[in-house]
């Protein structure tokens, strides 16, 4: 608390080299397992296939023919 109130004491600690809280990007990736993940891709899950199937089914049921018409 004294350091917070005393500007001279704060200045003395300003240049202190203390690595607490400093983590490199490589260390962060290793911690979360990000080294082996390709961020541009997302694996398809079973819920994705369910949504795709439902979307195609609904779309097909709304269109009376497979030909391109003004109604589709």
Curated annotation (Swiss-Prot):
The modification 2,3-didehydroalanine (Ser) is found at residue 48. Lanthionine-containing peptide antibiotic (lantibiotic) active on Gram-positive bacteria. The bactericidal activity of lantibiotics is based on depolarization of energized bacterial cytoplasmic membranes, initiated by the formation of aqueous transmembrane pores. When present individually, LchA2 exhibits activity towards B.subtilis L1 (IC(50)=30 uM), Rhodococcus sp. SS2 (IC(50)=16.6 uM), M.luteus B1314 (IC(50)=2.6 uM), B.megaterium VKM41 (IC(50)=2 uM), S.aureus 209p (IC(50)=20 uM), B.pumilus 2001, B.globigii I, B.amyloliquefaciens I, M.smegmatis 1171 and M.phlei 1291. This is Lantibiotic lichenicidin VK21 A2. There is a cross-link at residues 47-51, 59-63 (Lanthionine (Ser-Cys)). Keywords: Antibiotic, Antimicrobial, Bacteriocin, Lantibiotic, Secreted, Thioether bond. It comes from the Bacteria. It is found in: Secreted. The lineage of its organism: Bacteria, Bacillati, Bacillota, Bacilli, Bacillales. Residues 1-40 form a propeptide. The keyword Amino-acid biosynthesis does not apply.
């Amino acid at each position: 608390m004294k350091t917070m109130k005393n500007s001279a004491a704060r200045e003395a600690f300003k240049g202190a080299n203390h690595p607490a809280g400093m983590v490199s990007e490589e260390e962060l990736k290793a911690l979360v397992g990000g080294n082996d993940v390709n961020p541009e891709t997302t694996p398809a899950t079973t819920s994705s296939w369910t949504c795709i199937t439902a979307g195609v089914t609904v779309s097909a049921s709304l269109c009376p023919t497979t030909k391109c018409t003004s109604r589709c």
